[in-house]
């Protein structure tokens, strides 16, 4: 088996709607079944979960989030999971993988990058890659052809991510698709001057952790609650 691409440690956060294959994508990246996945429209990830694996000298952390892009999720649930995501991916993720299923592109996904910028900050898209799942459904079409022939909304999503996208066939046990994704992530990280994503939420959590403090309520909670309302409004927009 080819060696996992070596480099600095990597923190990955998976984001997407319920049922698009986030958990399966996490398992594909890690090369083993760490997250429970099921081909269902019901969420099998109830809370943010993290798995860490060492490949040679490289430590890779993957955070699987519940379907925060589902408009049916309550503001309270989203707040709780964003806090949890920040805590377990501190000091900040190198990449947000926006997971979208081939052949399925919903209203919420059309607005997803803009909504996530509202939630995490305007610079979040500089650290974002679109990861398409169910690549086998493409048939003889390449993912580049799929995006090119797709709707203007799909093109806009990839454009907002500076045309960074990749495709997985989660039933494919070969590691080539994973190594190619890691290569794209590494190039993006290099373009970001090797910096991970951070904002006031990550900075506050990291500062508390360095001081050994157990925080009951972070200062960023109040503004986060307001951003979640705007996030919901953007997602639901036609």
Model-derived features with residue positions:
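Glycine-rich, N-terminal phosphate-binding loop of Rossmann-like dinucleotide-binding domains
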Residues: 100-101
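C-terminal non-catalytic interaction/localization modules
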Residues: 1-62, 69-77, 88, 104-129, ...
């Amino acid at each position: 088996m080819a060696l996992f691409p070596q480099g600095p440690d990597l923190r990955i956060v998976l984001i997407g709607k319920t049922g698009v294959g986030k958990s399966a994508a996490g398992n594909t990246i890690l090369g083993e079944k760490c997250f429970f996945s099921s081909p269902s429209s019901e969420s099998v990830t109830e809370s943010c979960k993290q798995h860490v694996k060492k490949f040679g000298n490289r430590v890779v952390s993957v955070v699987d989030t519940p379907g925060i892009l589902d408009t049916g999720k309550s503001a309270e649930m989203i707040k709780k999971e964003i806090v949890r995501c920040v805590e377990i991916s501190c000091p900040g993720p190198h990449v947000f993988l926006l997971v979208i299923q081939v052949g399925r592109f919903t209203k919420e996904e059309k607005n997803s990058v803009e909504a996530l910028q509202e939630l995490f900050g305007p610079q979040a898209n500089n650290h974002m890659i679109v990861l398409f799942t169910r690549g086998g459904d493409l048939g003889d079409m390449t993912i580049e052809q799929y995006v090119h022939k797709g709707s203007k909304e799909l093109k806009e999503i990839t454009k907002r991510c500076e045309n960074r996208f990749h495709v997985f066939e989660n039933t494919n046990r070969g590691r080539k698709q994973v190594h190619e994704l890691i290569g794209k992530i590494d190039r993006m990280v290099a373009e970001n001057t090797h910096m991970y994503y951070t904002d006031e939420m990550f900075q506050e959590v990291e500062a508390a952790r360095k001081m050994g403090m157990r925080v009951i309520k972070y200062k960023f909670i109040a503004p986060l609650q307001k951003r979640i309302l705007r996030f919901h409004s953007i997602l639901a927009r036609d």
